[in-house]
């Protein structure tokens, strides 16, 4: 690739990019990664930066994906003590808003990027920054692997058992596709994933609202079961025992809170004013994640869902 300045002596204008003959590898690379950017173009950042809505799609998907497995794991951990799910619901929503508010404050104080590595390095020292950064890398690896594996489980649960041996291939393919999309750039990956993200939001809203609307008549039964469960639990385990059960379920569902930090880490790719854009994105993410996770737990109660382990115990 060669460049040529066709603007005379005016060196302020970005040079034109002239395509030279490309090898097969270069053409394949361009097909996978996209065309190169002209870094001298003064409008390049404006073109690739994200407004609040697009940032919510691109970065919010990290947090929202955890709602597909976090609430379920927490509910499973309750076992037969599903009456504690109402407290779990409140604790989950409160935790999401506390974490989101904390990262909003970090965004204000670190407007050029306030991830765990930067904050810990600046406030506590470089060693703590390395620990925080390493934890974040591990968290991202787990988030990707668990989210893709959970998606494969959900998809193959609708398919005949005969095709289950394709699950590993689909998981690996999903990771490869996501990696290639992100290598093309933040805005390109957001554009490609927007239909999937919006489909996730719309379907969850329909199912949660529909589940609540069609089972509102179950509310008196749920209230009675919760009161009865608390009375029996206090008599059987005491306050300390019930608190231990609740904490166990709460920690098992901690995956719900992964990905909230993505907005603070990705503030560099947001449209000016960055701080305001990042704060709006954080609000979108907090509300959508709290509503989705909380709505799923409410539907579990209304539908009187029993964890699988308890079903197996009942048949023994």
Residue locations for each model-derived region?
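Extracellular loop-to-transmembrane helix junctions
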Residues: 74-121, 126-135, 145-174, 199, ...
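Helix-loop junctions at the membrane interface of multi-pass solute transporters
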Residues: 58-59, 72-77, 104-109, 119-122, ...
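Flexible hinge motifs at transmembrane-helix junctions and intramembrane kinks/re-entrant loops
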Residues: 2-4, 156-170, 188, 213-217
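Extracellular/periplasmic helix-exit of transmembrane alpha-helices
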Residues: 211-221, 280-313
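Membrane-interface "cap" regions at the ends of multi-pass membrane proteins
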Residues: 2-70, 101, 112, 121-122, ...
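Hydrophobic, small-residue-rich membrane helices and short re-entrant helix-turn-helix hairpins
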Residues: 185-194, 259-288
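Helix-loop-helix junctions that connect adjacent transmembrane segments
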Residues: 42, 198, 202-256
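Select transmembrane alpha-helical segments in multipass membrane proteins
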Residues: 47-59, 125-137, 170-174, 234-250, ...
């Amino acid at each position: 690739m060669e460049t040529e300045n066709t603007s005379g002596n005016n060196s302020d204008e970005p040079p034109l990019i002239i395509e030279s003959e490309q090898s097969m590898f270069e053409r394949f690379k361009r097909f996978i990664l996209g065309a190169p950017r002209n870094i001298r173009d003064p409008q390049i950042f404006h073109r690739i930066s994200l407004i609040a809505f697009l940032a919510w799609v691109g970065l919010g998907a990290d947090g929202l994906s955890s709602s597909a497995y976090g609430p379920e794991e927490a509910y499973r951990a309750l076992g037969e003590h599903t009456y504690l799910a109402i407290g779990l619901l409140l604790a989950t929503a409160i935790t999401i808003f506390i974490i989101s508010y904390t990262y909003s404050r970090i965004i204000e104080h670190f407007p050029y990027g306030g991830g765990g590595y930067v904050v810990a390095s600046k406030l506590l020292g470089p060693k703590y920054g390395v620990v925080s950064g390493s934890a974040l890398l591990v968290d991202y690896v787990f988030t990707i692997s668990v989210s893709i594996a959970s998606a494969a489980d959900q998809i193959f649960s609708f398919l005949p058992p005969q095709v289950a041996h394709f699950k590993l291939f689909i998981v690996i393919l999903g990771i490869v596709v996501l990696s290639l999309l992100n290598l093309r750039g933040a805005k390109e990956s957001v554009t490609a994933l927007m239909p999937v993200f919006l489909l996730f939001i719309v379907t969850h809203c329909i199912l949660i609202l529909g589940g609540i609307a069609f089972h509102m008549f179950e509310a008196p039964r749920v209230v009675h079961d919760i009161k009865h469960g608390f009375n029996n639990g206090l008599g059987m385990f005491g306050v300390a025992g019930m608190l231990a059960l609740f904490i166990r379920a709460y920690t098992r569902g901690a995956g719900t809170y992964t990905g909230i930090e993505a907005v603070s880490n990705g503030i560099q790719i947001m449209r000016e004013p960055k701080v305001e854009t990042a704060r709006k994105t954080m609000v979108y993410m907090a509300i959508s994640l709290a509503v989705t996770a909380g709505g799923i737990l409410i539907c579990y109660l209304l539908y009187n869902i029993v964890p699988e382990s308890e079903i197996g115990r009942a048949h023994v």
